Regions:
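Cysteine-centered motifs
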Residues: 6-8
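Terminal, non-globular segments
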Residues: 32-249
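Short, strongly hydrophobic alpha-helical membrane anchors
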Residues: 17-38
Length: 249
């Protein structure tokens, strides 16, 4: 899901980390923060490139609608990044960002699962995917609204659901081997990026409450993993957009 900025660390947590550790440890933590800032910049760049790569496809009537409107996905991510930056520099109430971020999860879930579902060739697998979409949407909505106990639970569930959908896509490929090379198919690269992103993100998201409360020195590592997973996803999206050129030739 275009990236949901789940690990926006509060200043109070950072102060607690800095007060607790020795100078060498603080230097290590600072190094992770610098790396995190670098990766965040790369993340910005890849998301923006992805947006422009796909918005160019919108007017191309020869492409299927799922590719033509895929620019909507990175556009929501860019919006969240802007809101996060405004929040960081106190130009925006952070509650606005938090709620926008949480409810954007519904868009990410619906858009990605829809994109994957329409690429499924096997009728039984597609029917299964459609049923899962109908069942899981209200579950995620309820978690967004009512979950107050377990931090990031709604994100964990959403990413696990997306992982299931990407797995269905790969099963479908094995059952219905494409005539073209996989590496020339835009959808393959897009869904591969979504798959890798989910695989990398699920463990740190699932452990986030434990880490934030008990091992705050590892927050930087978790943010690094998160940024890396999203960078890989957007690079895969860009590759998918470039593959559309072969479809037009």
């Amino acid at each position: 899901m275009g990236f949901l900025r789940c690990f926006c660390v509060e200043k109070t947590v950072i102060r607690r980390v800095n007060a607790h550790f020795s100078l060498p440890k603080m230097a290590e933590i600072r190094g992770m923060e610098v790396l995190g800032e670098l990766l965040e910049t790369i993340y910005w760049i890849t998301a923006i490139i992805s947006f422009f790569a796909f918005i160019k496809l919108y007017s191309n009537k020869s492409l299927k609608i799922s590719l033509r409107i895929f620019f909507l996905y990175p556009s929501i991510t860019i919006l969240l990044m802007i809101l996060s930056t405004l929040c960081k520099y106190e130009y925006l109430d952070c509650d606005v960002f938090v709620y926008t971020n949480k409810y954007s999860l519904l868009f990410h879930f619906v858009f990605l699962t829809w994109f994957i579902t329409i690429e499924l060739k096997d009728s039984k697998i597609r029917k299964t995917a459609k049923s899962l979409m109908i069942l899981l949407f209200p579950l995620i909505l309820c978690l967004i609204i009512y979950n107050q106990e377990i931090k990031f639970l709604e994100y964990v569930v959403a990413y696990m659901c997306v992982f299931i959908f990407t797995s269905l896509y790969f099963v479908d490929i094995f059952l219905n081997i494409p005539e073209k090379q996989l590496t020339t198919i835009p959808d393959f690269w897009i869904i591969l990026g979504i798959f890798v992103n989910a695989v990398i993100l699920i463990p740190p998201l699932a452990l986030s409450s434990i880490v934030i409360n008990n091992y705050p020195n590892y927050i930087g590592l978790m943010k690094t993993l998160t940024s890396l997973s999203v960078i890989i996803m957007y690079l895969s999206f860009i590759k998918g957009a470039l593959c559309t050129r072969t479809l037009q030739n």
